[in-house]
Amino acid sequence: MNIKKIVKQATVLTFTTALLAGGATQAFAKENNQKAYKETYGVSHITRHDMLQIPKQQQNEKYQVPQFDQSTIKNIESAKGLDVWDSWPLQNADGTVAEYNGYHVVFALAGSPKDADDTSIYMFYQKVGDNSIDSWKNAGRVFKDSDKFDANDPILKDQTQEWSGSATFTSDGKIRLFYTDYSGKHYGKQSLTTAQVNVSKSDDTLKINGVEDHKTIFDGDGKTYQNVQQFIDEGNYTSGDNHTLRDPHYVEDKGHKYLVFEANTGTENGYQGEESLFNKAYYGGGTNFFRKESQKLQQSAKKRDAELANGALGIIELNNDYTLKKVMKPLITSNTVTDEIERANVFKMNGKWYLFTDSRGSKMTIDGINSNDIYMLGYVSNSLTGPYKPLNKTGLVLQMGLDPNDVTFTYSHFAVPQAKGNNVVITSYMTNRGFFEDKKATFGPSFLMNIKGNKTSVVKNSILEQGQLTVN
């Protein structure tokens, strides 16, 4: 899922003379004050101050992904020979799990463990009421190889892989899929894409009968959200940058249709570059914190990564035919913190909007956060479009720190709201792709997380079946 990119860097005066002459600390402090500014761009931010509190906070078990018993973990029986990782359920407009002719439906990325380029969306289904990992049936690939050409879409024709997204059960009983069209032909170009998936039921079987209305929705405008052309123009993979435009999550609010997605900021709302290191809005905390942290960052080995870090959870409005209606400001950004905030997920619960994202410590620029740290971060607002404030004061919702070679390693945590109560079901995948001959990437055991206002906590002793979606 991780792609490299680069963009133009803002030019900022260096302090070579001051460093050679001594007094480096004073020179940095003076320069920081001269260059400092505060610009929020009208959006919420994942701040350095909040993130720096997380290494201590994550020691609390209420934020820790449960430990799982390796001996109980099974491969998905109906996915023989396949690794299965990122997954998402067919959901109703309010985010609860839909029932399709008596079944729960899950879409997931799957492919051969021996071929990293083999990444396609498969459809799995399970009778409502059955929770066993062995009860999941596999309807196969959603798209035929020819579908990207049959769509007569200039972007789709260059697709080489299918990446994560979401699916909604429409008011007229249709399955509408949203996913990421990835092209290895164009420096990792990613585009938000949709199709109607036609499914029929026969006896105890769901069958995919092809797709229709298969089309590209959005591939970045450059101004609000970075596009791949900017990445290409300014150095592509050689920069250490990370271009993202993926993981579209469908949501409705007050009769309007939206996609929330992973992205990077564009040129008009907080672009990457050295000057971003002087924006107080990205730091949080007070003046003293900004002065100390910005000076430290300027001299850090992570300075370059921080300059390039401009992750965003973006939002666009859709027309009723699922074409682009309006490009909107990001819901939240992670400038100077990380370039990658994945698996966008948002829903309304008890009158509040909850926004979640997954991220890796290895992509972050925060002292105390390690490369093995895996996070789900969360934010809350009174409206879909924000402003968003961090849950649990910092945004920490879940942390997992296992070695990637551990069979019980999990990632791509996804919160599934329930029809009743204050608990959500957390799903994930378990075991990294291609790491073991006999242990495939599979649905991880689900578990419960409680949400109450601006606080969350993992529910003790709440481990469920692998891939379980509901408890009501």
Swiss-Prot record:
It holds the Pfam family Glyco_hydro_68. GO terms for biological process: carbohydrate utilization. Ca(2+) binds at residues 241, 272, 308, 310, 339. Sucrose binds at residues 85-86, 164, 246-247, 340, 360. It is an enzyme of class 2 (transferase). Belongs to the glycosyl hydrolase 68 family. GO terms for cellular component: extracellular region. It comes from Bacillus amyloliquefaciens. Catalyzes the synthesis of levan, a fructose polymer, by transferring the fructosyl moiety from sucrose to a growing acceptor molecule. Also displays sucrose hydrolase activity. The keyword Secreted applies. It comes from the Bacteria. It is found in: Secreted. The keyword Transferase applies. Induction: Induced by sucrose when expressed in B.subtilis. This is Levansucrase. It catalyses: [6)-beta-D-fructofuranosyl-(2->](n) alpha-D-glucopyranoside + sucrose = [6)-beta-D-fructofuranosyl-(2->](n+1) alpha-D-glucopyranoside + D-glucose. Ca(2+) may play an important structural role and promote stability of levansucrase. Its main location: secreted. Keywords: Calcium, Carbohydrate metabolism, Glycosyltransferase, Metal-binding, Secreted, Signal, Transferase. Its EC number is 2.4.1.10.
